[in-house]
Amino acid sequence: IVREISLDGDLGDGSFGVKISADQNLVASVYTYYESQSFRDFVWSTPSQSADELANGPITLNLGGLEPTLSLVSDNIDVVISWTDIKGKVSSTTFHESDFLQWQVPANTRQLSITRTPRGASLSGGALTWRGASGIAFLPLKSGSILDTAAKPISNAATIS
């Protein structure tokens, strides 16, 4: 059975999360169309796996200067997000949210770590989204995911560690 569910309502300009529960296996994705003054682009957002690995420690991502929007979905999001900039300065912030968290990664972030606090529930899923002058890209938080659909920055010696 193939079914299309239209999300025609005004979802705003930002990211959003869709949580699907089923008693059988299913395949799902979200088609997003993006248009700016100079181009048109689209992305198929695929599901991310449940982020149970957060229970065993942080999820760490090497961003190399990219500035995505991080989106997390869970009934009870209670996480500490730490990041290291290209100069080696470490910063962190704690989030206590329900259902959906959207956070813009600061400029010049080299590495990002997400750690669940003891009060937080397992994450239902998460993703990184990039929107900019050259298009849109989506990367689900899945073990082994590799971003290969967006332009990667040219690294210099200061970002290599």
Regions found by a protein language model. Give the residues of each.
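Conserved functional hotspot residues at active sites or interaction interfaces
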Residues: 25-76, 94-99, 106, 120-161
